[in-house]
Amino acid sequence: MPATSTHPHHPHQPHQPATARRARRTRGARLFATAAALATVAALSAALPANAHDNGHGGGHAPGKGHGGHAPARYQDVQLLSFNDLHGNLEPPSGSSGRVTELQADGTTKTVDAGGVEYLATHLREARKGHPYSITAAGGDMVGASPLLSGLFHDEPTIEALNELKLDVTSVGNHEFDEGARELARLQNGGCHPTDGCYTPDGFEGADFPYLAANVLDEKTGKPILKPYWVWKKNGVKIGFIGVTLEGTPNIVSADGVKGLAFKDEAETINKYAKVLEKQGVKSIVALIHEGGQPASASYNYDCDSPGAGDGISGPIVDIAKNVTPQVDALVTGHTHQAYVCSIDDPAGNPRMVTSAASFGRLYTDTTLTYDRRTGDIARTAVKSANRVVTRDVPKAADLTELIARWNTLAAPIGNRAIGYISADIDNTGSESPLGDLIADAQLAYGKELDPETDLALMNPGGIRAGLTYAAKGAEGDGVVTYAEGFTVQPFANTVNLQDFTGAQVVQVLKEQVSGSNAASPKILQISSGLTYTLDLTKSGADRVVTDSIKLNGAPIDPAATYRVATNSFLAGGGDGFTTLGLGTGDLVGTDDLTALAEYLTANSSAAAPIAPPAANRITIVQ
Protein backbone atom coordinates (compact mmCIF):
# COMPACT_ATOMS: atom_id res chain seq x y z
CA MET A 1 0.00 0.00 0.00
CA PRO A 2 2.65 2.73 0.12
CA ALA A 3 0.24 5.64 0.33
CA THR A 4 -2.73 3.50 -0.74
CA SER A 5 -4.68 0.55 0.58
CA THR A 6 -7.64 -1.58 -0.45
CA HIS A 7 -9.45 -4.48 1.11
CA PRO A 8 -12.33 -6.86 0.39
CA HIS A 9 -16.03 -6.16 0.82
CA HIS A 10 -18.25 -7.91 3.33
CA PRO A 11 -21.92 -6.89 3.24
CA HIS A 12 -23.77 -5.62 6.27
CA GLN A 13 -27.20 -6.49 7.56
CA PRO A 14 -30.22 -4.93 5.79
CA HIS A 15 -31.47 -1.52 6.90
CA GLN A 16 -34.65 0.50 6.65
CA PRO A 17 -34.96 3.33 4.11
CA ALA A 18 -34.09 6.84 5.27
CA THR A 19 -36.29 9.86 4.87
CA ALA A 20 -34.40 12.86 6.26
CA ARG A 21 -32.58 15.17 3.87
CA ARG A 22 -29.90 17.76 4.54
CA ALA A 23 -29.98 21.34 3.31
CA ARG A 24 -27.01 23.66 3.69
CA ARG A 25 -26.96 24.73 7.33
CA THR A 26 -28.54 28.09 8.05
CA ARG A 27 -27.75 30.41 10.91
CA GLY A 28 -31.17 29.81 12.40
CA ALA A 29 -30.49 26.12 12.92
CA ARG A 30 -28.24 26.03 15.92
CA LEU A 31 -26.77 22.65 16.77
CA PHE A 32 -25.48 23.35 20.24
CA ALA A 33 -27.28 25.16 23.01
CA THR A 34 -25.84 28.42 24.23
CA ALA A 35 -23.98 28.61 27.51
CA ALA A 36 -27.05 29.59 29.45
CA ALA A 37 -28.94 26.55 28.19
CA LEU A 38 -26.23 23.90 28.20
CA ALA A 39 -28.43 21.44 30.04
CA THR A 40 -31.24 21.71 27.52
CA VAL A 41 -30.24 18.53 25.77
CA ALA A 42 -33.43 18.27 23.79
CA ALA A 43 -32.38 21.38 21.91
CA LEU A 44 -28.84 20.08 21.53
CA SER A 45 -30.10 16.86 19.97
CA ALA A 46 -32.43 18.49 17.48
CA ALA A 47 -31.89 17.34 13.93
CA LEU A 48 -29.61 19.57 11.90
CA PRO A 49 -30.89 20.59 8.47
CA ALA A 50 -28.30 19.40 6.04
CA ASN A 51 -27.25 19.26 2.46
CA ALA A 52 -23.93 18.08 1.09
CA HIS A 53 -21.60 20.66 -0.39
CA ASP A 54 -22.35 20.43 -4.09
CA ASN A 55 -19.24 22.06 -5.48
CA GLY A 56 -18.30 19.91 -8.46
CA HIS A 57 -15.41 18.54 -6.46
CA GLY A 58 -12.55 16.74 -8.12
CA GLY A 59 -9.47 14.58 -8.04
CA GLY A 60 -6.11 15.36 -9.57
CA HIS A 61 -4.36 12.45 -7.82
CA ALA A 62 -2.93 9.24 -9.16
CA PRO A 63 -5.32 6.36 -8.44
CA GLY A 64 -4.65 3.96 -5.59
CA LYS A 65 -5.31 0.25 -5.67
CA GLY A 66 -8.84 -1.04 -5.94
CA HIS A 67 -11.90 -0.13 -7.97
CA GLY A 68 -10.89 2.20 -10.79
CA GLY A 69 -12.44 4.08 -13.69
CA HIS A 70 -16.12 4.93 -14.03
CA ALA A 71 -18.33 2.58 -12.04
CA PRO A 72 -21.43 1.08 -13.65
CA ALA A 73 -24.72 2.79 -12.86
CA ARG A 74 -25.21 0.52 -9.86
CA TYR A 75 -22.09 1.92 -8.20
CA GLN A 76 -21.17 5.47 -7.27
CA ASP A 77 -17.70 6.48 -6.12
CA VAL A 78 -17.85 8.91 -3.20
CA GLN A 79 -14.71 10.86 -2.41
CA LEU A 80 -13.93 11.32 1.28
CA LEU A 81 -11.26 13.94 2.01
CA SER A 82 -10.22 14.03 5.65
CA PHE A 83 -7.72 15.57 8.03
CA ASN A 84 -7.29 15.88 11.78
CA ASP A 85 -5.53 17.79 14.56
CA LEU A 86 -5.27 21.11 12.75
CA HIS A 87 -4.84 22.92 16.09
CA GLY A 88 -5.41 26.32 14.54
CA ASN A 89 -2.29 26.16 12.36
CA LEU A 90 -3.45 28.61 9.71
CA GLU A 91 0.01 29.72 8.67
CA PRO A 92 2.60 27.14 7.56
CA PRO A 93 4.04 25.55 10.72
CA SER A 94 7.75 26.17 11.27
CA GLY A 95 10.54 23.71 12.01
CA SER A 96 9.80 20.01 12.25
CA SER A 97 6.11 20.80 12.84
CA GLY A 98 5.97 21.95 9.21
CA ARG A 99 7.58 18.92 7.61
CA VAL A 100 6.63 15.34 6.81
CA THR A 101 8.88 12.35 6.19
CA GLU A 102 8.55 10.61 2.84
CA LEU A 103 9.77 7.08 2.17
CA GLN A 104 11.63 6.72 -1.13
CA ALA A 105 11.66 3.72 -3.46
CA ASP A 106 15.21 2.81 -2.43
CA GLY A 107 14.29 2.71 1.25
CA THR A 108 15.76 6.10 2.14
CA THR A 109 13.67 8.99 3.45
CA LYS A 110 13.46 12.69 2.78
CA THR A 111 11.57 15.52 4.43
CA VAL A 112 9.04 17.68 2.64
CA ASP A 113 7.83 21.10 3.78
CA ALA A 114 4.09 20.91 4.31
CA GLY A 115 1.09 22.68 5.77
CA GLY A 116 -0.65 26.04 5.81
CA VAL A 117 -4.36 26.49 5.13
CA GLU A 118 -3.71 28.62 2.03
CA TYR A 119 -2.10 25.54 0.50
CA LEU A 120 -4.54 23.08 2.07
CA ALA A 121 -7.42 24.94 0.44
CA THR A 122 -5.75 24.75 -2.97
CA HIS A 123 -5.04 21.03 -2.61
CA LEU A 124 -8.57 20.20 -1.44
CA ARG A 125 -10.19 22.25 -4.20
CA GLU A 126 -8.02 20.61 -6.82
CA ALA A 127 -8.76 17.17 -5.38
CA ARG A 128 -12.51 17.74 -5.62
CA LYS A 129 -12.49 18.54 -9.33
CA GLY A 130 -14.32 15.89 -11.31
CA HIS A 131 -15.82 14.34 -8.17
CA PRO A 132 -19.40 15.57 -7.82
CA TYR A 133 -19.85 13.18 -4.89
CA SER A 134 -17.31 14.52 -2.41
CA ILE A 135 -17.33 14.89 1.37
CA THR A 136 -14.76 16.64 3.57
CA ALA A 137 -14.55 15.42 7.17
CA ALA A 138 -12.23 15.85 10.12
CA GLY A 139 -11.19 13.87 13.17
CA GLY A 140 -11.19 16.51 15.89
CA ASP A 141 -8.80 18.99 17.52
CA MET A 142 -9.47 21.57 14.86
CA VAL A 143 -8.97 24.18 17.58
CA GLY A 144 -7.09 24.41 20.86
CA ALA A 145 -3.34 24.55 21.49
CA SER A 146 -3.30 26.96 18.56
CA PRO A 147 -0.66 29.49 17.48
CA LEU A 148 -1.23 33.11 18.42
CA LEU A 149 -2.92 34.02 15.13
CA SER A 150 -5.87 31.82 16.08
CA GLY A 151 -5.49 31.27 19.81
CA LEU A 152 -5.39 34.97 20.67
CA PHE A 153 -8.91 35.23 19.26
CA HIS A 154 -10.29 32.06 20.85
CA ASP A 155 -9.93 30.21 17.53
CA GLU A 156 -12.52 32.24 15.65
CA PRO A 157 -10.05 32.56 12.74
CA THR A 158 -9.77 28.77 12.48
CA ILE A 159 -13.53 28.27 12.40
CA GLU A 160 -13.76 30.88 9.64
CA ALA A 161 -10.97 29.11 7.74
CA LEU A 162 -12.70 25.73 8.05
CA ASN A 163 -15.86 27.32 6.67
CA GLU A 164 -13.82 28.51 3.66
CA LEU A 165 -12.39 24.99 3.28
CA LYS A 166 -15.98 23.70 3.01
CA LEU A 167 -15.57 21.25 5.87
CA ASP A 168 -18.74 19.16 6.05
CA VAL A 169 -18.43 17.54 9.47
CA THR A 170 -15.97 16.85 12.28
CA SER A 171 -15.85 14.98 15.54
CA VAL A 172 -14.85 16.85 18.64
CA GLY A 173 -11.41 16.19 20.08
CA ASN A 174 -10.08 16.70 23.57
CA HIS A 175 -8.83 20.19 22.70
CA GLU A 176 -12.31 21.32 21.72
CA PHE A 177 -12.91 21.31 25.49
CA ASP A 178 -9.87 23.41 26.46
CA GLU A 179 -12.10 26.40 27.18
CA GLY A 180 -15.11 24.32 28.18
CA ALA A 181 -18.38 23.21 26.65
CA ARG A 182 -19.81 26.72 26.71
CA GLU A 183 -17.04 28.03 24.50
CA LEU A 184 -17.47 25.04 22.19
CA ALA A 185 -21.14 25.99 21.94
CA ARG A 186 -20.11 29.49 20.88
CA LEU A 187 -17.74 28.18 18.22
CA GLN A 188 -20.61 26.10 16.84
CA ASN A 189 -23.32 28.72 17.09
CA GLY A 190 -21.50 32.04 16.82
CA GLY A 191 -21.69 35.15 18.95
CA CYS A 192 -19.14 37.40 20.58
CA HIS A 193 -16.79 36.08 23.25
CA PRO A 194 -18.39 36.60 26.69
CA THR A 195 -15.27 38.28 28.10
CA ASP A 196 -13.30 39.68 25.16
CA GLY A 197 -16.29 40.71 23.07
CA CYS A 198 -16.33 40.99 19.28
CA TYR A 199 -13.09 41.22 17.35
CA THR A 200 -14.63 42.47 14.11
CA PRO A 201 -17.59 44.74 13.27
CA ASP A 202 -19.43 41.84 11.63
CA GLY A 203 -19.23 39.67 14.74
CA PHE A 204 -18.67 35.91 14.68
CA GLU A 205 -21.16 33.63 12.96
CA GLY A 206 -19.82 30.24 14.09
CA ALA A 207 -19.21 27.01 12.23
CA ASP A 208 -21.05 26.11 9.03
CA PHE A 209 -20.38 22.43 9.80
CA PRO A 210 -21.62 20.25 12.66
CA TYR A 211 -19.40 19.11 15.50
CA LEU A 212 -20.29 15.52 16.52
CA ALA A 213 -19.83 14.22 20.06
CA ALA A 214 -21.74 10.98 20.44
CA ASN A 215 -19.83 9.87 23.55
CA VAL A 216 -19.87 13.20 25.42
CA LEU A 217 -22.87 13.27 27.72
CA ASP A 218 -24.44 15.82 30.00
CA GLU A 219 -24.12 14.18 33.43
CA LYS A 220 -27.53 15.52 34.48
CA THR A 221 -29.49 14.20 31.52
CA GLY A 222 -27.31 11.35 30.28
CA LYS A 223 -27.73 12.59 26.71
CA PRO A 224 -25.11 13.78 24.20
CA ILE A 225 -24.34 17.49 24.38
CA LEU A 226 -23.95 17.58 20.60
CA LYS A 227 -25.43 15.71 17.69
CA PRO A 228 -24.06 12.15 17.81
CA TYR A 229 -24.27 11.59 14.05
CA TRP A 230 -24.91 13.29 10.73
CA VAL A 231 -26.01 11.89 7.37
CA TRP A 232 -24.68 13.11 4.03
CA LYS A 233 -27.15 12.66 1.16
CA LYS A 234 -27.04 13.26 -2.55
CA ASN A 235 -29.16 11.76 -5.33
CA GLY A 236 -30.06 8.72 -3.26
CA VAL A 237 -26.56 8.15 -1.86
CA LYS A 238 -26.56 8.17 1.95
CA ILE A 239 -23.50 7.99 4.20
CA GLY A 240 -23.71 8.40 7.95
CA PHE A 241 -20.98 9.87 10.15
CA ILE A 242 -20.65 9.17 13.89
CA GLY A 243 -18.24 11.34 15.88
CA VAL A 244 -16.50 10.53 19.18
CA THR A 245 -13.50 11.72 21.15
CA LEU A 246 -11.28 9.57 23.32
CA GLU A 247 -12.89 8.30 26.50
CA GLY A 248 -9.87 9.55 28.45
CA THR A 249 -10.47 13.20 27.56
CA PRO A 250 -11.01 14.22 31.22
CA ASN A 251 -7.50 12.99 32.04
CA ILE A 252 -5.86 15.37 29.59
CA VAL A 253 -8.08 18.45 29.77
CA SER A 254 -8.43 20.86 32.67
CA ALA A 255 -11.18 19.93 35.10
CA ASP A 256 -13.08 23.15 34.37
CA GLY A 257 -13.18 22.27 30.69
CA VAL A 258 -15.10 19.02 31.22
CA LYS A 259 -17.11 19.90 34.31
CA GLY A 260 -20.55 18.31 34.22
CA LEU A 261 -19.66 16.04 31.29
CA ALA A 262 -19.22 12.27 31.04
CA PHE A 263 -17.10 10.62 28.34
CA LYS A 264 -18.11 7.11 27.31
CA ASP A 265 -16.41 4.17 25.60
CA GLU A 266 -15.66 4.94 21.96
CA ALA A 267 -16.54 1.58 20.38
CA GLU A 268 -19.66 1.02 22.46
CA THR A 269 -20.94 4.46 21.53
CA ILE A 270 -20.25 4.03 17.82
CA ASN A 271 -21.98 0.64 17.85
CA LYS A 272 -25.01 2.17 19.56
CA TYR A 273 -25.47 4.86 16.94
CA ALA A 274 -24.69 2.52 14.06
CA LYS A 275 -27.86 0.68 15.08
CA VAL A 276 -29.75 3.98 15.14
CA LEU A 277 -28.56 4.76 11.63
CA GLU A 278 -29.50 1.25 10.52
CA LYS A 279 -33.05 1.84 11.68
CA GLN A 280 -33.06 5.01 9.56
CA GLY A 281 -31.99 3.04 6.50
CA VAL A 282 -28.40 4.27 6.47
CA LYS A 283 -26.16 1.30 5.68
CA SER A 284 -22.95 3.15 4.80
CA ILE A 285 -21.22 4.56 7.89
CA VAL A 286 -17.92 6.31 8.64
CA ALA A 287 -16.70 6.78 12.22
CA LEU A 288 -14.79 9.95 13.09
CA ILE A 289 -12.70 9.00 16.14
CA HIS A 290 -10.41 11.37 18.00
CA GLU A 291 -8.12 8.60 19.16
CA GLY A 292 -5.26 7.03 17.28
CA GLY A 293 -2.25 4.80 17.09
CA GLN A 294 1.46 4.65 16.47
CA PRO A 295 2.61 3.34 13.08
CA ALA A 296 5.86 1.42 12.88
CA SER A 297 7.33 4.11 10.61
CA ALA A 298 7.27 7.90 10.75
CA SER A 299 6.95 8.11 6.94
CA TYR A 300 3.52 9.26 5.83
CA ASN A 301 3.54 6.81 2.91
CA TYR A 302 4.71 3.78 4.91
CA ASP A 303 2.94 0.55 3.94
CA CYS A 304 1.16 -0.08 7.23
CA ASP A 305 0.09 -3.54 6.10
CA SER A 306 3.52 -4.65 4.86
CA PRO A 307 4.29 -6.78 7.95
CA GLY A 308 0.77 -8.21 7.63
CA ALA A 309 -2.67 -6.60 7.67
CA GLY A 310 -2.77 -4.22 10.62
CA ASP A 311 0.64 -5.30 11.93
CA GLY A 312 2.22 -1.94 11.20
CA ILE A 313 0.31 -0.04 13.86
CA SER A 314 -0.14 -0.21 17.61
CA GLY A 315 -1.95 1.83 20.23
CA PRO A 316 -5.52 2.46 21.42
CA ILE A 317 -7.06 2.66 17.96
CA VAL A 318 -6.27 -1.00 17.27
CA ASP A 319 -8.47 -2.22 20.11
CA ILE A 320 -11.18 0.29 19.23
CA ALA A 321 -11.16 -0.76 15.57
CA LYS A 322 -11.42 -4.43 16.49
CA ASN A 323 -14.53 -3.71 18.55
CA VAL A 324 -16.39 -1.30 16.27
CA THR A 325 -19.29 -3.07 14.57
CA PRO A 326 -18.79 -4.30 10.97
CA GLN A 327 -21.65 -1.96 10.02
CA VAL A 328 -19.05 0.83 10.01
CA ASP A 329 -17.13 0.96 6.71
CA ALA A 330 -14.14 3.17 7.56
CA LEU A 331 -12.53 4.89 10.53
CA VAL A 332 -11.06 8.40 10.29
CA THR A 333 -8.90 8.88 13.37
CA GLY A 334 -6.51 11.35 15.02
CA HIS A 335 -5.08 12.50 18.35
CA THR A 336 -1.63 10.90 18.05
CA HIS A 337 -0.56 13.26 15.23
CA GLN A 338 0.63 10.28 13.20
CA ALA A 339 0.15 9.45 9.52
CA TYR A 340 -1.20 6.04 8.54
CA VAL A 341 -3.48 4.21 6.15
CA CYS A 342 -4.01 0.76 7.65
CA SER A 343 -6.29 -2.25 7.38
CA ILE A 344 -7.46 -3.52 10.78
CA ASP A 345 -9.89 -6.42 11.04
CA ASP A 346 -13.39 -5.68 12.29
CA PRO A 347 -15.07 -8.03 14.82
CA ALA A 348 -16.11 -10.33 11.97
CA GLY A 349 -12.48 -10.73 10.93
CA ASN A 350 -12.84 -8.63 7.80
CA PRO A 351 -10.31 -5.87 7.03
CA ARG A 352 -11.45 -2.26 7.32
CA MET A 353 -9.71 1.01 6.48
CA VAL A 354 -8.32 3.09 9.37
CA THR A 355 -6.66 6.40 8.50
CA SER A 356 -4.97 9.42 10.06
CA ALA A 357 -3.43 12.48 8.38
CA ALA A 358 -0.72 13.49 10.87
CA SER A 359 -1.43 17.01 12.19
CA PHE A 360 -1.31 20.76 11.58
CA GLY A 361 -2.74 20.49 8.06
CA ARG A 362 0.39 18.88 6.64
CA LEU A 363 -1.52 16.00 5.05
CA TYR A 364 -5.01 15.10 3.99
CA THR A 365 -6.37 11.63 3.33
CA ASP A 366 -8.07 10.88 0.02
CA THR A 367 -10.40 7.88 0.35
CA THR A 368 -12.74 6.44 -2.25
CA LEU A 369 -15.90 4.81 -0.92
CA THR A 370 -17.76 2.93 -3.65
CA TYR A 371 -21.46 3.06 -2.87
CA ASP A 372 -23.71 0.24 -4.09
CA ARG A 373 -27.04 1.81 -4.99
CA ARG A 374 -28.73 -1.59 -4.96
CA THR A 375 -27.78 -2.44 -1.36
CA GLY A 376 -27.14 1.06 0.00
CA ASP A 377 -23.85 -0.22 1.36
CA ILE A 378 -20.18 0.45 0.68
CA ALA A 379 -18.42 -2.16 -1.45
CA ARG A 380 -15.42 -2.62 0.79
CA THR A 381 -13.41 -4.42 -1.88
CA ALA A 382 -13.32 -1.11 -3.73
CA VAL A 383 -12.29 1.10 -0.82
CA LYS A 384 -8.96 2.79 -1.46
CA SER A 385 -7.14 5.40 0.54
CA ALA A 386 -3.96 7.47 0.39
CA ASN A 387 -2.37 10.23 2.42
CA ARG A 388 -1.47 13.28 0.30
CA VAL A 389 1.07 15.94 1.21
CA VAL A 390 -0.08 19.55 1.48
CA THR A 391 2.94 20.81 -0.41
CA ARG A 392 3.76 24.49 -0.67
CA ASP A 393 4.58 24.43 -4.38
CA VAL A 394 1.00 25.26 -5.39
CA PRO A 395 -0.66 28.69 -5.56
CA LYS A 396 -2.05 30.03 -2.31
CA ALA A 397 -5.83 30.26 -2.07
CA ALA A 398 -6.55 33.98 -2.23
CA ASP A 399 -9.51 33.87 0.16
CA LEU A 400 -7.43 32.17 2.86
CA THR A 401 -4.56 34.60 2.27
CA GLU A 402 -6.99 37.46 2.85
CA LEU A 403 -8.36 35.80 5.98
CA ILE A 404 -4.87 35.33 7.46
CA ALA A 405 -3.87 38.90 6.62
CA ARG A 406 -7.00 40.28 8.23
CA TRP A 407 -6.41 38.48 11.52
CA ASN A 408 -2.65 39.11 11.41
CA THR A 409 -3.36 42.83 11.32
CA LEU A 410 -5.13 42.48 14.65
CA ALA A 411 -2.51 40.17 16.16
CA ALA A 412 0.69 41.86 14.96
CA PRO A 413 1.07 44.52 17.68
CA ILE A 414 1.13 41.75 20.29
CA GLY A 415 2.69 38.89 18.38
CA ASN A 416 5.70 40.68 16.90
CA ARG A 417 7.15 41.77 20.24
CA ALA A 418 10.58 40.21 20.92
CA ILE A 419 10.77 38.33 24.22
CA GLY A 420 14.20 36.69 23.93
CA TYR A 421 17.07 35.38 21.84
CA ILE A 422 18.33 31.86 21.10
CA SER A 423 21.55 30.64 19.48
CA ALA A 424 20.05 27.57 17.77
CA ASP A 425 16.83 25.59 17.46
CA ILE A 426 15.53 24.48 20.86
CA ASP A 427 13.54 21.32 20.22
CA ASN A 428 10.68 19.76 22.14
CA THR A 429 11.42 16.19 21.03
CA GLY A 430 12.65 13.26 23.10
CA SER A 431 11.74 11.93 26.55
CA GLU A 432 13.63 14.87 28.01
CA SER A 433 13.76 17.79 25.61
CA PRO A 434 15.92 20.91 25.59
CA LEU A 435 12.84 23.10 25.48
CA GLY A 436 11.23 21.14 28.29
CA ASP A 437 14.25 21.83 30.47
CA LEU A 438 14.15 25.52 29.53
CA ILE A 439 10.47 25.85 30.43
CA ALA A 440 10.94 24.01 33.72
CA ASP A 441 13.83 26.34 34.55
CA ALA A 442 11.65 29.33 33.70
CA GLN A 443 8.92 28.12 36.03
CA LEU A 444 11.42 27.44 38.81
CA ALA A 445 12.83 30.96 38.43
CA TYR A 446 9.35 32.44 38.52
CA GLY A 447 8.45 30.27 41.50
CA LYS A 448 11.44 31.58 43.42
CA GLU A 449 10.23 35.11 42.74
CA LEU A 450 6.92 34.22 44.37
CA ASP A 451 8.51 32.19 47.15
CA PRO A 452 12.30 31.90 47.57
CA GLU A 453 11.77 28.48 49.16
CA THR A 454 10.65 26.95 45.83
CA ASP A 455 12.78 23.84 45.22
CA LEU A 456 11.92 22.44 41.80
CA ALA A 457 9.57 22.66 38.83
CA LEU A 458 7.79 20.01 36.78
CA MET A 459 6.30 20.52 33.30
CA ASN A 460 4.03 18.13 31.39
CA PRO A 461 5.37 17.34 27.90
CA GLY A 462 1.93 17.65 26.29
CA GLY A 463 1.81 21.29 27.28
CA ILE A 464 4.80 22.08 25.04
CA ARG A 465 3.19 22.38 21.63
CA ALA A 466 6.16 23.28 19.42
CA GLY A 467 9.88 23.94 19.47
CA LEU A 468 11.64 27.28 19.17
CA THR A 469 13.17 27.78 15.73
CA TYR A 470 16.34 29.84 15.19
CA ALA A 471 15.43 30.83 11.63
CA ALA A 472 13.25 33.92 11.44
CA LYS A 473 9.61 33.33 10.60
CA GLY A 474 9.00 36.96 9.66
CA ALA A 475 10.98 40.17 9.73
CA GLU A 476 12.19 39.78 13.31
CA GLY A 477 15.59 38.31 12.38
CA ASP A 478 17.24 34.96 13.07
CA GLY A 479 17.42 33.92 16.70
CA VAL A 480 14.73 36.32 17.87
CA VAL A 481 11.91 34.73 19.87
CA THR A 482 8.67 36.66 19.42
CA TYR A 483 5.65 36.62 21.67
CA ALA A 484 3.75 34.83 18.89
CA GLU A 485 6.36 32.06 18.86
CA GLY A 486 6.17 31.77 22.62
CA PHE A 487 2.40 31.56 22.38
CA THR A 488 2.73 28.70 19.90
CA VAL A 489 4.87 26.83 22.43
CA GLN A 490 2.60 27.46 25.44
CA PRO A 491 -0.91 28.44 24.28
CA PHE A 492 -3.06 27.18 27.16
CA ALA A 493 -2.86 30.14 29.57
CA ASN A 494 -2.23 27.80 32.50
CA THR A 495 -1.08 29.53 35.66
CA VAL A 496 2.16 28.69 37.45
CA ASN A 497 1.18 27.25 40.82
CA LEU A 498 3.25 26.50 43.91
CA GLN A 499 2.43 23.59 46.24
CA ASP A 500 4.07 21.73 49.10
CA PHE A 501 4.73 17.99 48.88
CA THR A 502 6.58 15.51 51.01
CA GLY A 503 9.66 13.88 49.56
CA ALA A 504 7.72 10.63 49.38
CA GLN A 505 5.07 12.37 47.28
CA VAL A 506 7.71 13.81 44.94
CA VAL A 507 9.03 10.28 44.38
CA GLN A 508 5.48 9.04 43.79
CA VAL A 509 4.89 11.78 41.21
CA LEU A 510 7.95 10.68 39.25
CA LYS A 511 6.77 7.07 39.38
CA GLU A 512 3.34 8.10 38.08
CA GLN A 513 5.09 9.02 34.82
CA VAL A 514 5.38 5.31 34.02
CA SER A 515 2.63 3.65 36.03
CA GLY A 516 -1.13 3.70 36.43
CA SER A 517 -2.81 5.36 33.47
CA ASN A 518 0.65 6.21 32.10
CA ALA A 519 2.03 2.66 32.20
CA ALA A 520 1.39 1.86 28.55
CA SER A 521 2.28 5.31 27.23
CA PRO A 522 4.63 7.07 29.68
CA LYS A 523 4.40 10.83 30.16
CA ILE A 524 7.89 11.99 31.10
CA LEU A 525 7.78 15.25 33.02
CA GLN A 526 10.27 17.92 32.08
CA ILE A 527 12.33 18.82 35.15
CA SER A 528 14.16 21.90 36.36
CA SER A 529 17.89 22.20 36.88
CA GLY A 530 19.14 20.40 39.99
CA LEU A 531 16.69 17.48 39.86
CA THR A 532 18.20 14.27 38.47
CA TYR A 533 17.26 10.60 38.35
CA THR A 534 17.58 7.41 36.28
CA LEU A 535 14.79 6.06 34.09
CA ASP A 536 15.38 2.35 33.45
CA LEU A 537 13.23 1.32 30.50
CA THR A 538 14.32 -2.31 30.80
CA LYS A 539 12.04 -2.58 33.85
CA SER A 540 8.26 -2.30 34.04
CA GLY A 541 5.76 -0.01 35.70
CA ALA A 542 6.81 2.25 38.53
CA ASP A 543 10.10 0.37 38.89
CA ARG A 544 11.31 2.15 35.77
CA VAL A 545 12.01 5.19 37.95
CA VAL A 546 15.01 4.16 40.07
CA THR A 547 14.17 5.49 43.53
CA ASP A 548 17.71 5.62 44.89
CA SER A 549 18.81 7.71 41.91
CA ILE A 550 16.44 10.61 42.59
CA LYS A 551 18.45 13.59 43.81
CA LEU A 552 17.95 17.32 44.19
CA ASN A 553 21.11 19.39 43.90
CA GLY A 554 23.11 16.22 44.45
CA ALA A 555 21.35 15.15 47.66
CA PRO A 556 18.89 12.25 47.90
CA ILE A 557 15.23 13.17 48.26
CA ASP A 558 14.22 12.95 51.92
CA PRO A 559 10.84 11.16 52.11
CA ALA A 560 9.87 13.06 55.27
CA ALA A 561 11.00 16.52 54.18
CA THR A 562 8.74 19.14 52.57
CA TYR A 563 9.50 20.41 49.07
CA ARG A 564 7.99 23.46 47.39
CA VAL A 565 7.12 22.53 43.79
CA ALA A 566 6.16 24.72 40.83
CA THR A 567 3.83 23.24 38.22
CA ASN A 568 1.24 24.59 35.84
CA SER A 569 -2.40 24.63 36.90
CA PHE A 570 -3.21 21.61 34.71
CA LEU A 571 -0.74 19.42 36.60
CA ALA A 572 -1.71 21.00 39.91
CA GLY A 573 -5.20 19.66 39.29
CA GLY A 574 -3.91 16.11 38.88
CA GLY A 575 -3.98 16.15 35.07
CA ASP A 576 -2.28 13.60 32.80
CA GLY A 577 -2.65 10.87 35.41
CA PHE A 578 -0.54 12.64 38.05
CA THR A 579 -3.06 12.25 40.85
CA THR A 580 -0.49 12.97 43.55
CA LEU A 581 0.05 16.46 42.16
CA GLY A 582 -3.57 17.16 43.01
CA LEU A 583 -2.85 16.53 46.69
CA GLY A 584 -0.45 19.39 47.39
CA THR A 585 -0.89 21.92 50.18
CA GLY A 586 -0.01 25.57 50.65
CA ASP A 587 -1.27 26.53 47.20
CA LEU A 588 -0.09 29.79 45.70
CA VAL A 589 -1.33 30.75 42.23
CA GLY A 590 0.87 32.94 40.06
CA THR A 591 0.81 34.39 36.56
CA ASP A 592 0.29 32.45 33.34
CA ASP A 593 3.01 30.10 32.11
CA LEU A 594 3.73 32.06 28.93
CA THR A 595 4.46 35.19 30.94
CA ALA A 596 6.85 33.18 33.12
CA LEU A 597 8.65 31.92 30.01
CA ALA A 598 8.77 35.37 28.41
CA GLU A 599 10.17 36.96 31.57
CA TYR A 600 12.83 34.25 31.84
CA LEU A 601 13.92 34.64 28.21
CA THR A 602 14.03 38.42 28.51
CA ALA A 603 16.06 38.30 31.72
CA ASN A 604 18.51 35.65 30.55
CA SER A 605 19.18 36.46 26.90
CA SER A 606 20.09 39.30 24.58
CA ALA A 607 21.06 39.71 20.95
CA ALA A 608 24.72 39.59 22.02
CA ALA A 609 24.26 36.71 24.47
CA PRO A 610 21.47 34.41 23.27
CA ILE A 611 20.35 31.34 25.20
CA ALA A 612 21.85 28.06 24.00
CA PRO A 613 19.77 24.86 23.94
CA PRO A 614 20.00 23.06 27.30
CA ALA A 615 21.86 19.74 27.21
CA ALA A 616 18.79 17.69 28.24
CA ASN A 617 20.93 15.50 30.50
CA ARG A 618 18.99 15.61 33.76
CA ILE A 619 17.35 12.23 33.24
CA THR A 620 19.67 9.25 32.68
CA ILE A 621 17.82 6.82 30.43
CA VAL A 622 18.69 3.11 30.43
CA GLN A 623 17.35 1.14 27.46
Where are each of the predicted segments found?
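Short, solvent-exposed aromatic-acidic interface loops
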Residues: 382-395, 551-554
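C-terminal region of N-terminal signal peptides and the immediate post-cleavage residues
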Residues: 43-71
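N-terminal leader/propeptide and maturation segments of large enzyme subunits in energy/redox metabolism
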Residues: 293-298, 412, 428-429
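Acidic, glycine-rich low-complexity/disordered segments
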Residues: 399-416
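Glycine-rich phosphate/diphosphate-binding loops and the adjacent beta-loop-alpha structural elements
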Residues: 413-432
